[in-house]
UniProtKB/Swiss-Prot annotation:
One of its GO terms (molecular function) is manganese ion binding. Glycans are attached at residue 78. This is Germin-like protein subfamily 1 member 13. It comes from Arabidopsis thaliana. PROSITE patterns: GERMIN. Oligomer (believed to be a pentamer but probably hexamer).
Length: 222
């Protein structure tokens, strides 16, 4: 994969998000570089901001998205996040970025971003992606097969997923309309909570035998 091609696609994704109305509060200053020093900062949008006169280029910089993340895990995918924790200068900017690597037949399992809409562009490989609408919309599935250069949008708060349906690795980049979009992975949340949800509740909710629920909870707690 040519680096120049990736950078162009990343830039296009970022521009699309930046022209949209951000979900995070709009900044009232040029920038607000996040710091952990409580004595020399002003609290804005969940972070303390350093004195603007002390800001430097490194506060707005991240290096490493040219490197593939390890997919040696149960879901065979890896998400490399670039948000306000990696780039302090993103504070109050209402935008962040991720790189997603998928092994053959790997997936980014069903999850939601409670604070952001996501726009994803596929760089290489073949993905089956989709999201499910709310109960009020009868939980409709919106899904597509993506090829390199294709773009798909996941609305804020909607459960969505991506699956590599090809025999080769896949790579995607996604922009998110929040400096800290958050992520809730459905299976991990429901079956791996601390403390665990009462198995009887989940058995009734999912219409499963309680023994199956207990087995699922044991798997997701490990």
């Amino acid at each position: 994969m040519r680096v120049s091609k990736s950078l162009i696609l990343i830039t296009l994704s970022a521009l699309v998000i930046s022209f949209a109305e951000a979900y995070d509060p709009s900044p009232l200053q040029d920038f607000c570089v996040a710091i952990d020093d409580l004595k020399n900062g002003v609290f804005v949008n969940g972070k303390f901001c350093k004195d603007p006169k002390q800001a430097k280029a490194e506060d707005f910089f991240f290096s490493g998205l040219n490197q593939a993340g390890s997919t040696n895990n149960k879901v065979r995918s890896n998400v490399t996040t670039v948000n306000v924790d990696q780039i302090p200068g993103l504070n109050t900017m209402g935008i962040s970025l991720v790189r997603i690597d998928y092994a053959p037949y790997g997936q980014n399992p069903p999850h939601t971003h409670p604070r952001a809409t996501e726009i994803l562009v596929l760089i290489e490989g073949t993905l089956y992606v989709g999201f499910v609408s709310s109960n009020q919309d009868n939980n409709r599935l919106f899904a597509k097969v993506l090829y390199p250069g294709d773009v798909f949008v996941f609305p804020i708060g909607m459960i969505h997923f991506q699956v590599n349906i090809g025999k080769t690795p896949a790579v995607a980049f996604a922009g998110l309309s929040s400096q800290n979009a958050g992520v809730i992975t459905i299976a991990d949340t429901v079956f791996g909570s601390t403390p665990p949800i009462n198995p009887d509740i989940l058995a009734q909710a999912f219409q499963l035998d309680v023994n199956i629920v207990e087995d699922l909870e044991a798997k997701f707690r490990n």
